[in-house]
Amino acid sequence: MEDGKRERWPTLMERLCSDGFAFPQYPIKPYHLKRIHRAVLHGNLEKLKYLLLTYYDANKRDRKERTALHLACATGQPEMVHLLVSRRCELNLCDREDRTPLIKAVQLRQEACATLLLQNGANPNITDFFGRTALHYAVYNEDTSMIEKLLSHGTNIEECSKCEYQPLLFAVSRRKVKMVEFLLKKKANVNAIDYLGRSALIHAVTLGEKDIVILLLQHNIDVLSRDAFRKIAGDYAIEAKNRVIFDLIYEYERKRYEDLPINSNPVSSQKQPALKATSGKEDSISNIATEIKDGQKSGTVSSQKQPALKDTSDKDDSVSNTATEIKDEQKSGTVLPAVEQCLNRSLYRPDAVAQPVTENEFSLESEIISKLYIPKRKIISPRSIKDVLPPVEEAVDRCLYLLDRFAQPVTKDKFALESENISEPYFTNRRTISQQSAENLDAACGIDKTENGNMFEDQNVDKEGKALPATGQKANVSPEQPPLFTHTVKDRDHISTRFLGGMDSLTSSEESSERPPLSTLTLKEADPSSKAAMRRKDSPPPGKVSSQKQPAEKATSDDKDSVSNIATEIKEGPISGTVSSQKQPAEKATSDEKDSVSNIATEIKKGQQSGTVSPQKQSAWKVIFKKKVSLLNIATRIMGGGKSGTVSSQKQPASKATSDKTDSALNIATEIKDGLQCGTVSSQKQPALKATTDEEDSVSNIATEIKDGEKSGTVSSQKQPALKATTDEEDSVSNIATEIKDGEKSGTVSSQKQPALKATTDEKDSVSNIATEIKDGEKSGTVSSQKPPALTATSDEEGSVLSIARENKDGEKSRTVSSRKKPALKATSDEKDSFSNITRGKKDGEISRKVSSQKPPTLKGTSDEEDSVLGIARENKDGEKSRTVSSEKPPGLKASSAEKDSVLNIARGKKDGEKTKRVSSRKKPSLEATSDEKDSFSNITREKKDGEISRKVSSQKPPALKGTSDEEDSVLGIARENKDGEKSRTVSSEKPPGLKATSDEKDSVLNIARGKKDGEKTRTVSSQKPPTLKATSDEEDSVLSIARENKDGEKSRTVSSEKPSGLKATSAEKDSVLNIARGKKYGEKTKRVSSRKKPALKATSDEKDSVLYIAREKKDGEKSRTVSSPKQPALKAICDKEDSVPNMATEKKDEQISGTVSCQKQPALKATSDKKDSVSNIPTEIKDGQQSGTVSSQKQPAWKATSVKKDSVSNIATEIKDGQIRGTVSPQKQSAQKVIFKKKVSLLNIATRITGGWKSGTEYPENLPTLKATIENKNSVLNTATKMKDVQTSTPAEQDLEMASEGEQKRLEEYENNQPQVKNQIHSRDDLDDIIQSSQTVSEDGDSLCCNCKNVILLIDQHEMKCKDCVHLLKIKNTFCLWKRLIKLKDNHCEQLRVKIRKLKNKASVLQKRISEKEEIKSQLKHEILELEKELCSLRFAIQQEKKKRRNVEEVHQKVREKLRITEEQYRIEADVTKPIKPALKSAEVELKTGGNNSNQVSETDEKEDLLHENRLMQDEIARLRLEKDTIKNQNLEKKYLKDFEIVKRKHEDLQKALKRNGETLAKTIACYSGQLAALTDENTTLRSKLEKQRESRQRLETEMQSYHCRLNAARCDHDQSHSSKRDQELAFQGTVDKCRHLQENLNSHVLILSLQLSKAESKSRVLKTELHYTGEALKEKALVFEHVQSELKQKQSQMKDIEKMYKSGYNTMEKCIEKQERFCQLKKQNMLLQQQLDDARNKADNQEKAILNIQARCDARVQNLQAECRKHRLLLEEDNKMLVNELNHSKEKECQYEKEKAEREVAVRQLQQKRDDVLNKGSATKALLDASSRHCTYLENGMQDSRKKLDQMRSQFQEIQDQLTATIRCTKEMEGDTQKLEVEHVMMRKIIKKQDDQIERLEKILQHSSLMLQVFES
């Protein structure tokens, strides 16, 4: 039975390969234990105490690495555990399975022991070999009390290894519902995941456990969690076809999203009311970062509000930055503060069930964005609400209010119908202000006119108590319409809607001009305590926005519009948009209103379209009303079937006795990427009020960053006003820095505004900077317009800007129409003719048109009219055309009129058969009366690249004020960037008007930096304008800068036109500084713009023109330029004024650009005016065959009877430097005043740089007028540049160059020397510390100009007076043509390189996809491997059980057979009993017969008859009795036999059936396993190729073996010589060998007899072998050695021959020596056996005992013992040889001796058997030693094998040695010395071979293990 128990216990490897729960108990064997372990096992407490008192190590381990504490816990002995713990036994030691005593106690449910361990500080978080803690085993055992104790003692409920489940997941995987419920109550992490990302819900779904699923759903588990295979629980439910569980998950998900708007609104807001009739609020900065990876979401919204106190209202509009990052084609939406009662659950859609959206569906949803907010309010219109609601209701019924999972697609027809229904009722069918009085409007809007002008709105109730519709929605409310609900949603309305296609966020925040803003702002007089202006803060990093505002005091209000920052980051297809809008009104005697910025950015990717139409109409009547049309900002971005809409609108009303109506400017930028269209519309409105109005327009900064479809933007605006008696106006500085690095963009915008108030009006025009960059076939168009009106008893109207951007790609169209109309008011009407720009671009049969019309009237006896500036930029690439027209017109007023005709500049560039023409015309007419008309300015630019068209229109209009008008035309900068079919346009216009008294106005610095890498372009436009007024009008014409860059055959044209007009009195103006810094760094850009303006006024104005520093540094083909132009005029009664310094620093690494712009201005007034035009320096850098063109034009008129004008000097510098070019141009101008003005000619610096096929063209025109009774007019300069491919020409400049200054070249050199001083001035500015970081790297060396460029400059300087003829111009043209040809050749080379780069990128993308796929496959394989391992373990266990069943069945079968045999023997016994009865019966019959005969003779006849009759009767009775006996016996026997047979048959049949079933099951299982094994073997074949490398390593080891063999060969050669002599002797002995053959035959017969005896002994040894098998591995092998020595002589002979052949191949010579040595040994041993059997037996016994002792220590010692035995045998063999010589002489005696030897051998065999018995008896005593030596068994095996081989060889060669006895006797003496040496060497070689064999075996095991691992991984 003990053997049976041992078989049940698995080995350590089997236990480790199992699941860890199969064999909880320890296999205990006596010889494994030590003293302390035995005491614990037997429960001998006293002995344990004794051992511990004697300082016995309590932590001592037994042979299975177990401590006494392990055994005490396993056997459940708390007393032992307490004693051991009290003796400070270590509690956290581990056994061979890495299990602590605590784990063992919990596993075996020994709660008392476990509690003792926990109370004494045992660590419950230790994991065992399987990665499980004690908590896992407690869960497995479902022991709740144990779990509670473990948790109470600090067990980590989530502790596990990487490859093991957490306890909760473990309970779910084991289907333990109670444990799952218990753990969830104990706050286990319900969303925990395993190493494959699977949650508990996924496990429960795969197992089909409905109860567990319900439990998990009750604890709010994340049903959208995805595992490593990107699947959720619903997917597994679908795969398992488990409808019940799927319905549970679906119902839970539906309910969760139904409750989301009420319970899960992720918005926190704080409100504090305003105190003491005033309220100031700072809206919070809402930063929403939504990152979704692998289907997970994270959203955060925070909003905080703080009020200010006392008579002041300071409001900071919130800046909402939304950064949405989407990866792995997932979509993320962030829900900002939700509107109450929002859209009946339509806005919150589950992401998991989101379906892709088609193009038609998108077109519907893009319309729904505007619909959601239009109809849900009261419309003050003669038409009923039915005109608006029906289409909206249809759309809502179809899309928004349907269930999330069942939204229906919308067809194109339906979309067309809905788009018409929205635009017409909402925009055209509204009541105008003329049909309503102001009171009615206020009443309808719910405006409460109080002293404080505060409008508080509660939920659905305004301050007046007027009930409002409780819709909970905030819609797009028009100026005539009251809001449906008031501001109750945390002062801001953020709506996030997710449409069908995925998680698209739509945020809209809009207000009407008639109701208070969402933040419930109030408007009141400024408090004197708020005089100090807040300092500007540096622009925050990307993703953050900071805005600061301070209002001015007394009868003025400063209202700032919100800064809407939309940063959208899109990765790999998803899109997310967020919009934040803020609204602020201004009231009481003055109103400051800022027009909202409407930015509509529609980005469509993958064949989807987005169209936005926003028409606006406004009229003015009676008491001038101020009306604002709501701003609709819709940013609809769709990528990868997803949509994201963003809507931002800002509205600010102003009221009380005056109203100003400003139409919105609708800017539509359409971006197309991959056949998609994107539209962006930005409009700004500014009204004029009675009294004075301080108005700051909002800064709308839209930074769109795309990185592989990702966007990121940051906007920072700061506003600061100035106070009293003077007005200082700084236009906002809009800096849009778009950085693209590897397709990524980062934009930062900072703007600061400072208004000045009181009896003066300070008006700031908004700077709308839209930087749109498109990469990979995207287009970006941005249009920004700003308009300031005139104030005080006059009406200023600005004509509408109609920008139509139509882009068609792949048959898709996107149209946007924006119209604005303003009528003329009161006694005067000024009409501006509409400016119509029609741009038609065709690509693939597509047409796009744009129309822009503007009409402004002028007021009161004078009319000032400025036509709109329409810039349409068209770029044609690859056979397309490019034209640019720029015109600017300023009017003159009072007794003089100046009319300027439009300047039409048409630049047409063609590459590959295209032409480029440029026309620049300048016209200046003079007019009488008081009409000044300025014709419209039309710029038509057409850009086509790969069939894509983009247009931009920018118009700016300023009106005249109060008998005088001061107008500054806008600076229109159009920067176009094309990269690989991408286009980017930016239009910026700014207009400041002149105001009462004296006004110093600084125009905003517009810095637009755009950088693209790999075919991307950058442009930056910066303009600054300051006007001054005093009973005179100063006009500055707009500067239109059109930069066109064509890449891959595109051309660059620059047109500059300037027009000055003369007016009365004197005026000083400062022209804007246009700073354009363009840098490229592998697609990265960094731009910083800082502008500071400080005005000073005192009847005089001194102007100092700006210093423009543009420094560009490039590494590896980058350029650096620095241009500075300082101007210092002489003044009388001088008041110095420093204008703002815009510094643009663009730093780039690996092609970085650093630019610094410094602009300083000082004006002076009083009867004299010194006017200097700004120096516009435009450096354009083109990399990778890109072109950049920038044009800056400035116009300044001069008045008072004289006008002096200087023409510009054009300097063309071309620098070529290997990779880096740095140019410095320094123009200085100084003018003198007082009656005579000195006229200076502006510098036109054109720097053309060619580096690797790059072009950069820059033109700088400056016009400076002078005064004093004379007017000089200059004709316009017509510049026509035509570029052809292979033959190109350009005419960059045709200008009148009169009165050239000979000192220009000297000034250039002086400026270069003075440039460091200018830098010091720039660095001294506090506001520029952050911006000038990269400007310090600007090079001041002017010697980098190449000789050719200098020669060109000298030619221009020399011929400046003679440039009217064409000869000189042709010379200049020829120089340009040469350079252009070189550039073109390099462009072609760059194109080829680009193609290669694109191919490489495509390959890289393909490889990345493959890598990702392989990684997924690997993860799947790992998962399958683990499952297969578990299956294999389970199969092994099943096979073992089946084997046990078979054994049991066989035993039963044998028992049945024995019973059958017993029954058969009983039958035989009964048959034997019946046999003797039969003869007795026969003898009785014979006696009867004889008796009858006798009776007849004796008796009489009567008696005879009687007797006969009686006899007959007796015989009959006897016969009957016999028959009865026989029948009874037979019946009994038959019954017995039948019963027995039936029982036996039944048993037999049952056994046969059981056997058949078992056989069938085994066959099935074997077939299944064989199929699996076949599959595994097939996979193994694939892995064999991988093993070749490992085989190579094995071959290396073989080479090492060969090196050892070489050494052996050398030794063998030495031995060959010694053996040669021995061979000769052997030949001599051959004769004697023949004689001995007869003796050999006899010996063979004896050997056969001995072999039989050995076979018998062998059978006995096998029996002993089975017994030794359980004793230990060492004893087994030793027993085998002795068994094989006697049993396998013949087998070993055949094996020896094979071995000899193996050795002969490699060791021919060595083997012969070895054979001889073995022969001698065998002879000696045999002789010893024959003569001294007793001595041999004793020696062997001693040697065996020594060997057993030596096995424990060393294997080498045993080998030496064997050698000692061999030597002793040799001595005995010598004596035997002498006897054998005598035997040869006497054969008869030998025969007798052989017979004796046989008997002796039999005795020897018996002795050996007795010795073995003794050894076995001693084995029990040596078990402990053998266990200790088990670790050395591997080494002993090799030694034993060697000894076996020796013994086999000795016995196999026994016969041969007998034949050669006579020969060996003679040679023994000679060979003894040699043999000893050989033996020593042989032993050494054996050791070496053993070591090598061990190494080889280890390597083979490692290879096998690695191959198995590879197979497992690949399977």
UniProtKB/Swiss-Prot annotation:
Bias-annotated ranges (Polar residues): 262-272, 297-306, 597-619, 645-657, 1175-1196
Family: Belongs to the ANKRD36 family.
Protein name (record): Ankyrin repeat domain-containing protein 36A
Composition-biased stretches (Basic and acidic residues): 551-562, 585-596, 806-815, 874-883, 931-951, 976-985, 1044-1053, 1100-1121, 1134-1152
UniProt KW Repeat keyword: yes
Coiled coil: 1383-1466, 1504-1531, 1573-1614, 1727-1814
Composition skew (Low complexity), residue ranges: 505-521
Region (Disordered) residue spans: 261-331, 470-619, 639-663, 676-1203, 1285-1304, 1489-1508
Mapped ANK repeat ranges: 31-60, 64-93, 97-126, 130-159, 163-192, 196-225
Organism of provenance: Homo sapiens (Human)
